[in-house]
A protein has these predicted regions:
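Membrane-interface interhelical loops and short amphipathic "cap" helices
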Residues: 1-10, 37-40, 64-86, 136-155, ...
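N-terminal signal-anchor module of multipass membrane proteins
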Residues: 1-45, 50-58
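Long, contiguous internal "core" modules enriched in hydrophobic/ aromatic residues
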Residues: 14-18, 38, 91-93, 98-213
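Residues within alpha-helical transmembrane segments of multi-pass membrane proteins, especially transporters
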Residues: 20, 24, 54, 61, ...
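Short gly/ser-rich anion-binding loops that grip negatively charged ligand groups
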Residues: 51, 63, 83-94
Length: 213
């Protein structure tokens, strides 16, 4: 039981963070495809972007508690590049900073044109994907042979696409309540969710098979 409690913050970090990241990936896909979102829809979308950001902030707090003493979090700078856990947190912090900057710039009305908004949201989504890969690599520990494979990363990416797309799709549909998402944008959101579910199932099945060997 003590071991479960000790690892709970890390599990919460990975789960909550992946959902927040996936929401930004879903929003980027919709923004890139849907070039005709009205000003009112964009304003609502920018306000609701606070939801995945809150997810990410909560996840980061969980990560700090996994360190044992949150006050020692500043010491992670000494292990950048040598500790998978540190690399994971640093990559996530970079993503979160970019996401917050994007959100604030959008709220200020500086991303009304489709081009700059699509590029900026794409950068945030790419940083999120890198962060998810780092999360998966943090679990690939030589001391635990079952985890020491790329399939853990596959699981994280699948969970990110599935959970994040559900959150991002909900936010997008709340933003464009007068006119539903264009068919192509809505189709891509659904495709991302199905792809995420498939990837998650494959990753889980392979790891389960490894356990049985």
């Amino acid at each position: 039981m003590d071991a479960v409690i000790k690892e709970l913050p890390l599990a919460l970090f990975t789960t909550i963070a992946s959902v927040g990241i996936g929401a930004f990936v879903a929003m980027f896909c919709a923004i890139y495809v849907n070039k005709s979102m009205g000003a009112g829809s964009l304003k609502r979308l920018d306000k609701l972007t606070a939801v995945p950001i809150v997810f990410c902030v909560v996840a980061l707090i969980c990560a700090f508690f996994h360190l044992g003493d949150p006050l020692h979090a500043v010491n992670i700078v000494n292990t950048i590049g040598s500790s998978p856990m540190t690399n994971e947190i640093v990559a996530f912090c970079v993503f979160l900073v970019l996401a917050v900057v994007y959100w604030l710039v959008a709220l200020a009305g500086k991303l009304e044109k489709h081009g700059p908004r699509a590029v900026f949201s794409g950068i945030v989504a790419l940083a999120g994907l890198v962060s998810c890969i780092m999360m998966g690599l943090a679990y690939a520990l030589p001391a635990i042979p079952i985890w020491n494979s790329p399939w853990g990363t596959v699981q994280v990416l699948g969970a990110m696409l599935l959970g994040g797309t559900l959150l991002g799709g909900t936010i997008l549909n709340m933003s464009v309540r007068e006119t539903p998402l264009e068919g192509e944008a809505d189709g891509r959101i659904r495709l991302l969710a199905m792809l995420g579910g498939l990837v998650l199932i494959i990753g889980t099945a392979v790891l389960f098979g490894i356990c049985l060997l």
